[in-house]
Structures are given as C-alpha cells and as structure tokens.
Amino acid sequence: MAIGSKIIKPGGSDPDDFEKSIAQALVELEANSDLKPYLRDLHITRAREIEFGSKKAVIIYVPIPQQKVFQKIQIILVRELEKKFSGKHVVVIAERKILPKPTRKARNPLKQKRPRSRTLTAVYDAILEDLVFPAEIVGKRIRVKLDGSQLVKVHLDKNQQTTIEHKVDTFTSVYKKLTGRDVTFEFPDNYLNV
C-alpha cells in the first residue's frame, strides 16, 4: 500500500516528513487491524504537530466528505495513533475554508451569496465540535471582558467526562493555536434531573 494514497494535499503539493509518518501509520493500521474496511477509502489532507508547555499534540486534517466515516472509527483510530506516537494526543479535524466577508466596495462581487458554513463563526464552532468528539457540547457561555477580549466556556456532556477529561488541556491549547481564542471546558452537572 502506497503512502501517497493516504495523504492527498490540496493543490497537489508534496507532504513533509511528519505528514509522511502519519500516512505510514495509517497504512500500517490498515494492513493489520480490523479497521481495514473503513480505512481503505480514507485519506488525510495534512497534519501538523504543535507544542504546548512540555507536551505535544498531533492535528490531523481530513476532507469534509470523509469526516463522518472518520468519526465512526475515531475512538479506536486515535487510541492506536497515540500508541504509535508515544503518548502524544491526536486530534482529528475536518479541513474547512473560511470565505472573507463581502465588502460593499468589492471590485469583483461574489457570484453567489456566502454560505453560512464558510463564515468564520461557523468554522470556529465546527472546529470546536471536531476537537471534543466523541463528547457533545451541551452548552456554551461567552464572556466578554471590559477590554473586549472574549472567554468562551464550553459545557461538555458529563457522561463523557472519564474518556476525555485528561485531554482538556490539549483541546484548549489546540483551539487557541488554530483560532486565537481562549476557551475553557467544563463538565457541569445535569440541570434537569428527570
């Protein structure tokens, strides 16, 4: 199995060494695991490694049409990749594009109206949901400070606390690196005890 089939970069550029190592790990997982039927048709678009404090995290970007299939196997896939990359936290995010806000004096106005899924807010919210998968976001509070900076408090599903609580610091730093926004994650008790 060729590594080139596992990483297809937009624009046809060549992958770097780190991206090749991720693609090689995917090829090895496909060769000797029960993920083979899922991984056969899947590929990634790019990968990068970020450092925060003394830890490192791996961000893997996948095409949006393949995101649902990746999410079916994401728990097992992330666990296996974390073993291969010696305990670095692995995060899978869909490759999304932000279109600029149309201005009134645009020389070449957009042929179509900008879709909601390409706005900055929608893309940042989608990145947040991709980060915390398989947990669900059950609430969100945005606190605007007097200097204009924002602090986003994200409430996650209490049922998933044991599975992702150890990754919360990773999620915070990855989101800050990707979007420049501060975010904190909480696991509030259920308000409605039915």
Curated annotation (Swiss-Prot):
Q: Name one GO molecular function term.
A: structural constituent of ribosome
Keyword check for Transmembrane helix: no
Question: What keywords tag this UniProt record?
Answer: Ribonucleoprotein, Ribosomal protein
Alphabetized PROSITE patterns for the sequence: RIBOSOMAL_S7E
Q: Which GO terms describe its cellular component?
A: cytosolic ribosome; cytosolic small ribosomal subunit; nucleus; small-subunit processome
- What InterPro entries does this protein map onto? Ribosomal_eS7 (IPR000554), Ribosomal_eS7_CS (IPR047861)
Pfam families tied to this protein: Ribosomal_S7e
- Gene Ontology process terms (BP): cytoplasmic translation; ribosomal small subunit biogenesis; rRNA processing
Record-stated family: Belongs to the eukaryotic ribosomal protein eS7 family.
What name appears for this protein in its UniProt entry? Small ribosomal subunit protein eS7
Its lineage reads:
Eukaryota, Metazoa, Ecdysozoa, Arthropoda, Hexapoda
